[in-house]
Curated annotation (Swiss-Prot):
Organism annotation: Bordetella avium (strain 197N)
PANTHER family given in the database record: 3-ISOPROPYLMALATE DEHYDROGENASE
Catalytic activity, as annotated: (2R,3S)-3-isopropylmalate + NAD(+) = 4-methyl-2-oxopentanoate + CO2 + NADH
InterPro entries: IsoCit/isopropylmalate_DH_CS (IPR019818), IsoPropMal-DH-like_dom (IPR024084), Isopropylmalate_DH (IPR004429)
Keywords of the record: Amino-acid biosynthesis, Branched-chain amino acid biosynthesis, Cytoplasm, Leucine biosynthesis, Magnesium, Manganese, Metal-binding, NAD, Oxidoreductase
Cross-referenced SUPFAM superfamilies: Isocitrate/Isopropylmalate dehydrogenase-like
Name of the gene this protein is made from: leuB
Protein name per the record: 3-isopropylmalate dehydrogenase
GO annotation, biological process: L-leucine biosynthetic process
Family matches, as SMART domains: Iso_dh
GO cellular component, one term: cytosol
């Protein structure tokens, strides 16, 4: 059966890095139908909207979406609803993407590029699972008003609402436990249950779900301690599951442990396994068109696409092994280049991965 992939390169370095990931997917000779469409600023320029109906329709009808990056300074003056970044939010809503998976893997060859000492991060291989659709980012009511009470009653105040429904917590908890079950059977749930009612509710539900996974070791950690432990002893973790706000912060922190955000893929999944796959980095308009962007995060995102949405784990393993081989050969794009290694361009890195696949 042919499986359809929506290819959305986007802005900045997006087209350059997605091109290399597409080359890798095509080299596998799988029955894939790759259809490309505009998104973000590129879509606004062409259709006056960052997520045109045709692009959204393609994404909905596909088994998975391979996404590049969106955003450019030239769009900063647009009304918020027309800015490129709204495209990714719109896709998350329309596809019901609620689980964000962010691996943080330190390849041995890049240990010296990490922010931490090699002996602390050597062998790091963790995954952070972030809930995407709830929490303070989407809770209502929110806004600016005259404070109705408190010490500063009558002054202007900004306010947001942190909230989670039971079903939202249950489904992300299941993703966490299922992921842990396939790895080392350790799951750490991160919250702020000592202060927030929402977090205590989160913890209670996670504990209930844990009864269905007696083979998985569950632990809990307050988010402030988790942020510290990721720097102090990151290898104590295997799978972390947490809410939208905490996950947003912790996943970026974990990214810096690996040496370069240009190496980190991500997946966002819905209940049926349909997913959006993208590198964790942004559109980097300052280096767009120079041929120096690192395509490995996007290529690894394509591997996640094969693993989680197309049920092709063996092909995903092939891509990941090819990336490891290329790094072992000493090939580096500018962001991870250091003395004693060979600097290559975006397309040359793609060529090397293709050769390693053969």
């Amino acid at each position: 059966m042919t499986q359809k992939i929506a290819v959305l390169p986007g802005d900045g370095i997006g087209p350059e890095i997605v091109e290399q990931a597409v080359r890798v997917l095509q080299a596998l000779n799988l029955p894939l139908e790759l259809q490309e469409a505009k998104v973000g600023g590129a879509a606004f320029d062409a259709f006056e909207h960052p997520l045109p109906p045709a692009t959204l329709g393609l994404a909905k009808s596909s088994h998975a979406v391979l996404f590049g990056a969106v955003g450019d300074w030239k769009y900063d003056s647009l009304p918020r609803e027309f800015r490129p970044e709204q495209a990714i939010l719109g896709l998350r809503r329309a596809l019901g993407l609620f689980a964000n998976l962010r691996p943080a893997i330190l390849y041995p060859e890049l240990a010296s590029a990490s922010s931490l000492k090699p002996e602390i991060v050597a062998g790091l291989d963790i995954i952070i699972i972030r809930e995407l659709t709830g929490d303070i980012y989407f809770g209502t009511p929110r806004g600016v008003r005259s404070a109705p009470d408190g010490v500063f009653s009558g002054e202007r105040e900004g306010y947001d609402t942190m909230r989670y429904a039971e079903s939202e917590v249950r489904r992300i908890a299941h993703v966490g436990f299922e992921t842990a079950r396939k790895r080392n059977k350790k799951l750490c749930s991160v919250d702020k249950a000592n202060v927030l009612e929402t977090s205590q509710f989160w913890r209670d539900i996670v504990i209930e779900v844990a009864r269905e996974y007696p083979d998985v070791e569950l632990s809990h950690m307050y988010v402030d301690n988790a942020a510290m432990q990721l720097v102090r002893n990151p290898r104590q973790f295997d799978v972390i599951v947490t809410g939208n706000l905490f996950g947003d912060i912790l996943s970026d922190e974990a990214a810096m442990l690996t040496g370069s955000i240009g190496m980190l893929p991500s997946a966002s999944l819905n209940a049926s396994g349909q997913g959006l796959y993208e590198p964790s980095h942004g559109s980097a308009p300052d280096i767009a068109g120079q041929g120096i962007a690192n395509p490995l995060a996007t290529i690894l995102s394509a591997a996640m696409l094969l693993r989680y949405s197309l049920n092709q784990p063996a092909q995903a393993d092939r891509i990941e092994a090819a990336v490891r081989k290329v790094l072992a050969q000493g090939l580096r794009t500018a962001d991870i280049h250091e003395a004693g290694t060979t600097k290559v361009s975006t397309s040359q890195m793609g060529d090397a991965v293709l050769k390693a696949l053969a």
